């Protein structure tokens, strides 16, 4: 999905309002879309690339932003390729999210395939039961 198209979609979540759409959130950080409810954030990135480093970078930037009073989740909307599936990226990010736990208020990362998030050009309501069914959810849990 093209960047501009993604940013112009009507992303929604119960109780949240669009806070930022492609603008600079903080120095050097321009996520595709951010929804906000008080100090609770939903940060969204849509990526068509295949670089696992890119997804890790998105997660690190969200983790760095979500500190002090700010808390929230990250949603990665991914166009799958044979060498880059949602499941593969989730497994790759899982241990890094656990490692980041003491440093951030980023607690959950959702990964969802583009066509599942936006069937018929209408995005799913974020965090809805349908969204939860279609996405892979990784939590910041300490590995033992």
Task: Give residue ranges: language-model regions.
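Acidic-basic catalytic patches of nuclease active cores, encompassing PD-(D/E)XK
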Residues: 1-25
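Non-catalytic C-terminal interaction segments of nucleic acid-processing enzymes
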Residues: 25, 68, 94-144
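Short strand-coil-strand connectors
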Residues: 27, 36-38
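Conserved catalytic cores of phosphodiester-cleaving nucleases, focusing on short active-site segments
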Residues: 33-35, 42-48, 62
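Short loop/turn segments at strand-loop or loop-helix junctions that form parts
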Residues: 38, 47, 76-81, 111-116
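Structural motif
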Residues: 40-42, 73
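Catalytic cores of nucleic-acid endonucleases
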Residues: 48-99
């Amino acid at each position: 999905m093209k960047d501009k198209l993604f940013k112009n979609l009507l992303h929604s979540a119960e109780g949240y309002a669009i806070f930022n759409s492609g603008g600079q959130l903080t120095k050097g950080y321009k996520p595709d879309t951010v929804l906000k409810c008080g100090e609770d954030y939903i940060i969204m990135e849509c990526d068509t690339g295949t670089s696992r480093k890119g997804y890790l970078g998105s997660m690190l930037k969200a983790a760095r932003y979500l500190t002090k009073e700010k808390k929230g989740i990250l949603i990665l909307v991914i166009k799958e390729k044979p060498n880059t599936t949602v499941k593969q990226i989730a497994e790759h990010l899982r241990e890094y999210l656990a490692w980041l736990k003491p440093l951030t208020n980023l607690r959950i990362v959702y990964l969802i395939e583009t066509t599942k998030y936006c069937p018929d050009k209408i995005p799913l309501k974020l965090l809805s039961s349908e969204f939860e069914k279609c996405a892979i959810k990784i939590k910041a849990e300490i590995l033992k």
